[in-house]
């Protein structure tokens, strides 16, 4: 029977896509200290400043500055040629130019006035450096090859080699390359199927490799694209471009290995320097220089709420001036110490991203989940490096946590959810609908905050008890009293906080790939249960109650659907909504107005209602409120049923009556 088959398919469908909820952790690894070359001699466009390395230089003196748009030079490694022609074309003409173009438009730097020539790597780790030298000198000469991440640096991009037996016995060997002119940063692009690419979640990774002498700004880096992860599929475009932009930003400055080199607004080091101009404390165990507390500090939250009582919870805060200002502005919390950094994820994620719980879909959090945006906070971070002047006009709006106040920014998500429940309020942006209990789907679709996609609450059971500081529930409906400590949001990096998350699903052979974004036409199928319309003009609308499907006395309640994607348009100050196979669009005159849809499709009567959002959420120009008619939607329709079926039912009922009379 159709209802049974559809229900079984629907349940299996939800269980099957659960493992594919979007979550791609960043694969960044801080480069080893020995792989980073500092003190690359350069010339900036500030004639009144002496370049460091000359006798009259003072590495802490403020510069006379002129900033100009960042110029990034792409240099493609020969490994790119191993990609298919279609993928090569995508990488060369779309993926890299778009990712690089974003940062060139977003950032200004002190421009280079001469070609960049990079340092050669020394044979040994010992070298000489003294005032008056143009270049760092190697004690045993230079290596044949100088690499930048996965890339070999062309000899034409390199300085000659200065080798010394002692500070007074030096000679120059090798050729002085022409360098790379008209650029401020060289990005070496590779496509090696490296060991780091073996994980199915790794799309690309990047890091810086050389820093200039005057201000310590990174001037060269490598981005490696994992060949098997590259796709020209429309559904993969957003995540690929966002990931490459994210990785490039690690090379430009968002790196735990660079915090100790940050400068203030006058160009002075934030972290104390030794007589050689380097940060004073090298943490060999962790592989980076330690920074001063004016950059990052640890704060103890002494009353961190959990479902089992309050605990002390340490957090790490970026406390530089612009970052603090933007964090306070975003949450509307004037007492917030700064912006929280990630405290989970291990090497490469810990401290090198924004905290996922606090800034969920900010693109510089440690894992991609949905709708990544580069917000004012990340641009403020770049300004506080002392290397960049950001263009805040390119910042994207971060809805997560916006203007939710100090309680949201400074307390656990468990306390936020608990207090909202007591008040009878929605726990936005968190949720408490269980996605599945480990054996069956309990998923219910909702709209994302931006109303551009369907989403599911990612609250799931784990096999082991959650860490005590991340037990965010005292109890959960339908879960035994001792079971709540096993439940949390599926994104561990978000402190196990549950939130609405977009989803996707693929066939094993990758012949089909769909996700929950309303804007992609390929995500929909004509005549599906709730009569959705996917496409460029579609948005997400929520339902006041589940849809139903009826035929001949049989009824199916589509309880998993509480939202869907529908076409919309703005006309004469009014928002209109369209469903599948509708001849006309339905007007939304006011927020929370209901639109009633009734259609006969494939012999079944489909019935459902949509809730109208604020007109301003979707339309630029909205008219004044009007009197809402009592009913807006389709006229009443009879439940389909063939005459033969009706006669059969009538005969069966008569037979039952006859048996009853006889008894």
Swiss-Prot record:
Cofactor note: Binds 1 zinc ion per subunit.
This protein's GO CC annotations: cytoplasm; membrane
Co-factor requirement: Zn(2+)
InterPro entries assigned: Peptidase_M8
Any GO BP annotation: proteolysis
Locations listed in the record: Cytoplasm
Keywords from the named record: Cell cycle, Cell division, Cytoplasm, Hydrolase, Metal-binding, Metalloprotease, Mitosis, Protease, Zinc
EC number from the UniProt entry: 3.4.24.-
Chain sites annotated for binding Zn(2+): 246, 250, 353
Gene Ontology MF term list: metal ion binding; metalloendopeptidase activity; peptidase activity
Catalytic residues (positions): 247
UniProt cross-references to Pfam families, sorted A to Z: Peptidase_M8
Functional note: Essential for the coordination of mitotic progression, and also plays a role in cell migration.
Family that this chain belongs to: Belongs to the peptidase M8 family.
Matches recorded under PANTHER family: LEISHMANOLYSIN-LIKE PEPTIDASE
UniProt name for this protein: Leishmanolysin-like peptidase
């Amino acid at each position: 029977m159709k209802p049974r088959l559809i229900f079984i398919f629907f349940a299996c469908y939800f269980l099957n896509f659960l493992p594919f909820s979007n979550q791609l952790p960043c694969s960044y690894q801080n480069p080893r200290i020995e792989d980073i070359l500092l003190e690359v001699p350069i010339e900036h466009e500030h004639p009144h400043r002496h370049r460091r390395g000359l006798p009259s230089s003072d590495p802490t003196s403020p510069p006379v500055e002129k900033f100009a748009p960042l110029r990034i030079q792409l240099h493609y490694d020969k490994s790119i040629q191993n990609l298919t022609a279609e993928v090569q074309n995508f990488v060369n003409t779309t993926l890299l130019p778009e990712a690089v173009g974003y940062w060139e438009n977003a950032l200004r730097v002190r421009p280079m006035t001469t070609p960049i020539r990079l340092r050669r790597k020394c044979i040994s780790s010992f070298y000489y450096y003294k005032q008056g030298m143009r270049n760092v000198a190697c004690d045993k000469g230079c290596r044949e090859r100088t690499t930048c991440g996965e890339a070999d640096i062309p000899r034409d991009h390199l300085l000659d080699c200065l080798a010394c037996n002692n500070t007074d016995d030096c000679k120059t060997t090798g050729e002085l390359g022409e360098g790379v002119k008209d650029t401020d940063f060289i990005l070496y692009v590779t496509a090696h199927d490296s060991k780091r690419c073996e994980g199915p979640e790794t799309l690309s990774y990047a890091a810086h490799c050389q820093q200039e002498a005057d201000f310590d700004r990174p001037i060269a880096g490598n981005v490696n694209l994992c060949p098997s992860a590259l796709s020209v599929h429309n559904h993969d475009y957003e995540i690929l471009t966002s990931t490459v932009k994210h990785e490039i930003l690690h090379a430009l400055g968002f790196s735990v290995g660079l915090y100790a080199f940050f400068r203030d607004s006058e160009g002075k080091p934030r972290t104390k320097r030794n007589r050689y101009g380097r940060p004073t404390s090298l943490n060999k165990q962790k592989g980076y220089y330690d920074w001063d507390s004016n950059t990052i500090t640890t704060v103890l939250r002494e009353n961190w709420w959990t479902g089992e009582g309050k605990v002390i919870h340490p957090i790490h805060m970026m406390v530089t001036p612009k970052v603090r200002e933007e964090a306070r502005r975003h949450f509307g919390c004037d007492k917030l110490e700064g912006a929280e950094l990630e405290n989970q994820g291990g090497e490469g994620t810990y401290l090198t991203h924004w905290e996922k719980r606090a800034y969920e879909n900010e693109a510089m959090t440690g894992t991609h989940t949905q709708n990544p945006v580069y917000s004012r906070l990340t641009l403020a971070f770049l300004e506080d490096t002392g290397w960049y002047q950001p263009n805040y006009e390119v910042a994207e709006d971060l809805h997560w946590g916006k203007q939710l106040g100090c309680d949201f920014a400074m307390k656990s998500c468990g306390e936020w959810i608990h207090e909202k429940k007591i008040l009878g309020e929605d726990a936005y942006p968190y949720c408490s609908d269980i996605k599945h209990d480990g054996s069956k789907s309990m998923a219910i679709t909702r709209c994302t905050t931006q109303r551009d996609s369907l989403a599911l609450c990612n609250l799931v059971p784990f096999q082991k008890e959650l860490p005590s500081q991340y037990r965010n529930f005292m109890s959960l409906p339908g879960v035994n009293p001792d079971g709540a400590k096993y439940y949390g949001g599926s994104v561990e990096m978000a402190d196990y906080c549950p939130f609405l998350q977009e989803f996707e699903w693929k066939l094993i052979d990758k012949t089909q790939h769909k996700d929950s974004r309303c804007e992609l036409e390929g995500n929909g199928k004509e005549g599906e249960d709730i009569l959705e319309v996917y496409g460029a003009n579609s948005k997400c609308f929520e339902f006041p109650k589940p849809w139903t499907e009826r035929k001949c006395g049989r009824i199916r309640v589509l309880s998993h659907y509480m939202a869907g994607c529908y076409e919309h348009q703005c006309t004469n100050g009014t928002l209109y909504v369209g469903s599948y196979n509708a001849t006309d669009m339905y007007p939304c005159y006011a927020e929370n107005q209901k639109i009633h849809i009734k259609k006969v499709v494939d012999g079944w009567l489909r019935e459902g209602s949509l809730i109208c959002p604020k007109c301003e959420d979707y339309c630029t120009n909205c008219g004044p409120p009007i009197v809402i008619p009592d009913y807006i939607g389709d006229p009443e329709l009879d439940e389909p049923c063939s005459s033969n079926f009706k006669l059969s039912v009538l005969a069966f009922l008569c037979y039952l009556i006859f048996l009853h009379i006889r008894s």
